[in-house]
């Protein structure tokens, strides 16, 4: 059983590569992609109980991933939102966490950690007792 995911990413090449790798390595099925804050926020709100994981880039074609993140504050406990950005500074990590991000990953240096986090979430979905370790960034 795959983890049902949404991807907010405006770079088509990055989105394509992430979708393929997430499915292959982590059993994460990306069911929709949005390139703007509006697209992402609307999809996540309209499908509020249908997703397990949202992966959000901070810089989108329109708006911000921080706005998407803020819109997910009232999500179910089982739903996770992670930020994937080229700008994972300490300030961005702090702000994203304050807005409810479960984790923040740097695109240039922490993709393996993102994949490990996603694999852990998939394992926990299949076996709620699995994956007792936590990857906080």
Which residue ranges define each predicted feature?
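Conserved acidic carboxylate
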Residues: 9
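Two-component/phosphorelay signaling modules centered on CheY-like receiver
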Residues: 12-33
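Acidic, metal-coordinating helix/loop segments flanking the phosphotransfer/catalytic sites
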Residues: 33-53
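Acidic catalytic/metal-coordinating carboxylates
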Residues: 36, 64-67
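The short loop immediately C-terminal to the conserved phospho-acceptor aspartate in CheY-like receiver
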Residues: 58-59
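Short amphipathic alpha-helix used as the core "switch/output" element in two-component signaling
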Residues: 66-77
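Alpha4 helix (beta4-alpha4-beta5 surface) of REC/receiver domains from two-component response regulators
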Residues: 88-105, 109
């Amino acid at each position: 059983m795959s983890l049902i995911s949404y991807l907010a990413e405006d770079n088509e090449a990055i989105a394509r590569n992430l979708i393929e790798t997430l499915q292959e390595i982590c059993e994460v099925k990306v069911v929709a992609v949005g390139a703007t804050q509006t697209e992402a926020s609307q999809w996540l709100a309209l499908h509020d109980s249908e997703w397990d994981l949202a992966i959000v880039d901070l810089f989108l074609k329109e708006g911000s991933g921080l706005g998407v993140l803020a819109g997910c504050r009232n999500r179910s406990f089982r739903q996770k939102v992670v930020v994937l950005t080229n700008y994972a500074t300490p300030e961005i990590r702090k702000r994203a966490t304050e807005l409810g991000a479960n984790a923040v990953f740097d695109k240039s240096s922490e993709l393996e950690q993102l994949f490990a986090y996603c694999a852990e979430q998939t394992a926990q979905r299949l076996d709620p007792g699995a994956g007792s370790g936590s990857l906080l960034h």
